Regions:
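Ribosome-associated RNA-binding proteins
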Residues: 1-135
Length: 135
């Protein structure tokens, strides 16, 4: 469950590594898998050889977002246990999201890691098609 001030991993290649939830859209309850949230980019992901330990850390041209940007995101994994209709219980190791634009399309072109199958019920099939595996 994701609520205000929760730090969430960003698993796409948009350039964000860690984001902070500032609002759960269309709900007064905490966000679950498939819910849309508003986030602020807290930490950027470094790409390329120039961002190594010996070199100067630079903002790569591959980054589509910067630190401090306010974006929409979809929750794809939560650390809180939840029960599926068939009785199985699912729990992930971390909280993760995918950044999207205002139209609901993912900003990144590749996802790292698995996503929950509940995204299919919430009509996020574009995110499911980018993911390497869904559980």
């Amino acid at each position: 469950m994701i609520q205000l001030k929760t730090l969430v991993n960003c698993i796409d290649n948009s350039g964000a590594a860690i984001v902070e939830c500032v609002n759960v859209l269309r709900s007064k309850r905490p966000a679950k898998v498939g819910d849309r949230i508003v986030v602020v980019v807290q930490k950027q992901r470094n790409f390329g050889p120039e961002s190594g330990p010996g070199g100067a850390v630079s903002i790569s041209a591959a980054n589509k977002v910067r630190r401090g940007d306010i974006r929409h995101a979809v929750v794809v994994r939560t650390a809180k246990k939840y029960q599926r209709p068939d009785g199985s219980v699912v729990k992930f190791d971390d909280n993760a999201c995918v950044l999207i634009n205002k139209a609901g399309e993912p900003i990144g072109t590749r996802l790292n890691g698995i996503v929950a199958a509940e995204l299919r019920e919430k009509k996020w099939s574009k995110i499911l098609s980018l993911a390497p595996m869904h559980l």
